[in-house]
Amino acid sequence: MTRRISLTQYLVEEQRERGRIPAQLRLLLEVVARACKSIAISVNKGALGGVLGSAGSENVQGEVQKKLDIIANEVLIEANEWGGALAAMASEEMDSIYVVPNRYPQGEYLLLFDPLDGSSNIDVNVSIGTIFSVLKKQSDTPGVSTQDFLQPGSAQVAAGYCVYGPQTTLVLTVGDGVAMFTLDREQGSWVLTTDEVRIPEDTREFAVNMSNQRHWAPPMQRYIDECLQGKDGPRGKDFNMRWVASMVADVHRILCRGGVFMYPWDKREPAKAGKLRLMYEANPMGFIVEQAGGAATNGKQRVLDLQPSQLHERVSVILGSKNEVERASAYHREAG
C-alpha cells in the first residue's frame, strides 16, 4: 500500500536516501507544483473567474490562445523566475526563451513547459493539464541561449505533468520511476497516492484522432486497420478507441491502465514531422512513459534519442504499452 506522504517528503527522501536530486532541483520541483495548484484554482473557477474563451491572440505555432493559456503561462513564469534554481524558461506560448532577469540569482536548470495542454477543451469542462520538463545547462559559459535548450530528451533530469480533472493529479519522474500525487484541497498539499506506476506491456486500447486516418502514412494506416478488424483480423483481439484531444488526459489514462497514444505524421503538412512539440510535450511524456515501463517513438526512433534543432520542433509520437508501440514502430521501419 502506498504511503500517504507529502510531495515535499517524497522529494526529500529522493534527495537524502537515493541521492537522485540535488537540493536546487528539489526546490524547483516544489515551486512548479505550487504553480500548478494556482493554475488549478483558475481552471476550477471557470466562467465565475472570467477565464474562459479566446484571448484574441495567437502563439508562435499560429494557434489561437485561450485566456487560460496566457494565465497559466504567466503563473509558471512568475512562480519560477525568482527562486535561484533556473537560468531560463521556454514555453509553447512564447516565441523565444525567457531568461531569468538580472535582479534575480541565476541557477543551472532550464525549465520547459506547455502551460495548458488540451486548451480546446477548456470551455467544455473536459480534462486539461500542464506538462513540464527540466534540463541542466551544459555549458559553463556566462549567460544562456536557445542552444542551451537543444538537448535530447535523454538529458532530462525531471519531467511531469498536472492533470486538472475530477481530481487534480501531479505525475512526476526524476529518473527513478513514476509517482502520482493528488491535491488535497482541504490541506492545500500534494499527497502521494500511487508510487511505482507501471504500464502494462499489452493493451486493447488505442488513442488517436480517427478523423485524420485518410491523411496518415501507410504504416499507421496498417496498424489501425488491424486494430479495427479486432478478433477477426490478424491481431486476434478486439480493441477500444479512446480520444480526449488532450495529451495529458490520454497519457494519464495510459499510465493508469495501459494503452497506446498516437499522433502521427499527416500528409496535409508533409514538411512537418508531426503535430506535437518535441521539447515540452513529447520529451517529458516520453520520459514519464519509459520510467513507467512503456515506450515512446516517432515511428522509427526512440523519442528521447532525437536531437532537436529548434525550440519549437515538432515530432510524430507513438507512446504507451511497450508491445503495441513496438508493433506500430516495426511497421514504420519495414516501410523504410
Swiss-Prot record:
GO terms for cellular component: cytosol. It comes from the Bacteria. One of its GO terms (molecular function) is fructose 1,6-bisphosphate 1-phosphatase activity. Gene3D superfamilies: 3.40.190.80, Fructose-1,6-Bisphosphatase, subunit A, domain 1. Substrate binds at D117, G118, S119, S120, N209, K275. One of its GO terms (biological process) is fructose 1,6-bisphosphate metabolic process. Mg(2+) 2 binds at D114, D117, E281. It is an enzyme of class 3 (hydrolase). The lineage of its organism: Bacteria, Pseudomonadati, Pseudomonadota, Betaproteobacteria, Burkholderiales. This is Fructose-1,6-bisphosphatase class 1 2. It catalyses: beta-D-fructose 1,6-bisphosphate + H2O = beta-D-fructose 6-phosphate + phosphate. It comes from Methylibium petroleiphilum (strain ATCC BAA-1232 / LMG 22953 / PM1). Disulfide bonds: none annotated. It is found in: Cytoplasm. Mg(2+) 1 binds at E92, D114, L116. The keyword Transmembrane does not apply. Keywords: Calvin cycle, Carbohydrate metabolism, Cytoplasm, Hydrolase, Magnesium, Metal-binding. Its main location: cytoplasm. Its EC number is 3.1.3.11. The keyword Hydrolase applies. Its cofactor is Mg(2+). SUPFAM superfamilies: Carbohydrate phosphatase (SSF56655).
